[in-house]
Amino acid sequence: PSVHGLADDRLRIQVDGMDLVSACGNHMNPPLSYIDPTRVGSVRVFAGITPVSVGGDSIGATIQVDSPAPEFALAGEGRRVQGQAGAFHRSNGDGMGLNLSATYATEQMSLRYDSSAAEADNYKAARDFKAAGPAASDKPAQWLGGDEVGSSSYKTRNHSLAYAFRSDEHLVEMRLGLQDIPYQNYPNQRMDMTGNDSHQFNLRYQGQYSWGQLQARAYHEKTRHAMNFGEDKQFLYGPANNVPGMPMDTEGKTTGVRVKGDITLSERDTLR
């Protein structure tokens, strides 16, 4: 995203309360890619000056993206079981995807699983914009049509498991996330993403006390990210065409802890 002409690291992006950054040196996996669109419950944007309570450390803006809050059974309902599923197909590029979620909840406990997958081949323009031919000189069998936009294919899979437990005044929630992107090609870049595996652990506590409210969060995210020339790009370089690609392998880790307390001093004053 871009806010007031500022983007990338000039924006602070929080996904389910986690301050995430791009593990890729070329920023091919921006923070918003860590959550599937079908899991988004709310989006808040603080443009310009950002409150300290949401980070405060950004030039352009702070963007908060959160999954839906845990659902519990109503009083006297017993157990709640619900789910949803969706799918799509797009003729251009033969794009397709599916998503599903399932929830099991009582009055004190909530368990939810989300899964999604999407993939597509190269998409096509409205008409020919180039001559048809091989994708590269060292790939004569990889044929691209005159209307085909090379290096525009992708494949992604996302899984999430959330568990929450509550009492009268307290709530504990744990989220586990797994992302697997075998490939995501870029028609406007020299390199493609040839692998992206991410694991996320997110633990949250919220409690109400006689003196006020306490919130705490601890999280850890690990990403293994790989880049190289994809199937639609020249792979062999050099004077003798003997330099194989330009592999880049990155491992990124992000660990964070946040504690926030609201102390009620009077009906008018609160100390945070």
Predicted regions and their residues:
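Hydrophobic, lipid-facing positions within transmembrane beta-strands of outer-membrane proteins
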Residues: 59-61, 81, 96-100, 109, ...
